[in-house]
């Protein structure tokens, strides 16, 4: 019987490969995206210091309504606002091994519209 590939393991493998080449600094931190079946999470991370500078997710009260794509747009807007409040305008986008499509793209577009450059 042919075994079916585990999509999450393949995603984690892609993410590890990309993370070897991608790093966030204090000047240009990394915007990391994690997507689950029920929600989406975004963090602005300074990898040099190992500190999360700003974050937003569907667990926040402002975001919990709407479809998954609408929630991703709201998370992108919220993380951009929180990053701008801390003086962060440029980031490196880390899609977390996910395709740049759907909820990940919606979050990225919303973050760009609200002032983050990447």
UniProtKB/Swiss-Prot annotation:
<keyword id="KW-0687">Ribonucleoprotein</keyword>
<comment type="similarity">
    <text>Belongs to the universal ribosomal protein uL18 family.</text>
</comment>
<protein>
    <recommendedName>
        <fullName>Large ribosomal subunit protein uL18</fullName>
    </recommendedName>
</protein>
<keyword id="KW-0689">Ribosomal protein</keyword>
<keyword id="KW-0694">RNA-binding</keyword>
<dbReference type="GO" id="GO:0003735">
    <property type="term" value="F:structural constituent of ribosome"/>
</dbReference>
<dbReference type="GO" id="GO:0022625">
    <property type="term" value="C:cytosolic large ribosomal subunit"/>
</dbReference>
<dbReference type="InterPro" id="IPR005484">
    <property type="entry name" value="Ribosomal_uL18_bac/euk"/>
</dbReference>
<dbReference type="GO" id="GO:0006412">
    <property type="term" value="P:translation"/>
</dbReference>
<dbReference type="GO" id="GO:0008097">
    <property type="term" value="F:5S rRNA binding"/>
</dbReference>
<comment type="subunit">
    <text>Part of the 50S ribosomal subunit; part of the 5S rRNA/L5/L18/L25 subcomplex. Contacts the 5S and 23S rRNAs.</text>
</comment>
<feature type="region of interest" description="Disordered">
    <location>
        <begin position="1"/>
        <end position="25"/>
    </location>
</feature>
<dbReference type="InterPro" id="IPR004389">
    <property type="entry name" value="Ribosomal_uL18_bac-type"/>
</dbReference>
<keyword id="KW-0699">rRNA-binding</keyword>
<feature type="compositionally biased region" description="Basic residues">
    <location>
        <begin position="10"/>
        <end position="20"/>
    </location>
</feature>
<comment type="function">
    <text>This is one of the proteins that bind and probably mediate the attachment of the 5S RNA into the large ribosomal subunit, where it forms part of the central protuberance.</text>
</comment>
<dbReference type="Pfam" id="PF00861">
    <property type="entry name" value="Ribosomal_L18p"/>
</dbReference>
């Amino acid at each position: 019987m042919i075994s079916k590939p585990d999509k999450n393991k393949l995603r984690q493998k892609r993410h590890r490969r990309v993370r070897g080449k991608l790093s966030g600094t204090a000047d240009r931190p990394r915007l990391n995206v994690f997507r689950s079946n029920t929600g989406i999470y975004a963090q602005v991370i300074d990898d040099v210091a190992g500190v999360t500078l700003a974050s937003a997710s569907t667990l926040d009260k402002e975001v919990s309504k709407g479809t998954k794509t609408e929630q991703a747009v709201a998370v992108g807007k919220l993380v951009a606002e929180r990053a701008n409040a801390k003086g962060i305008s440029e980031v490196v986008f880390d899609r977390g091994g996910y395709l740049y499509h759907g909820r990940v793209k919606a979050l990225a577009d919303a973050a760009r519209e609200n002032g983050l450059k990447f």
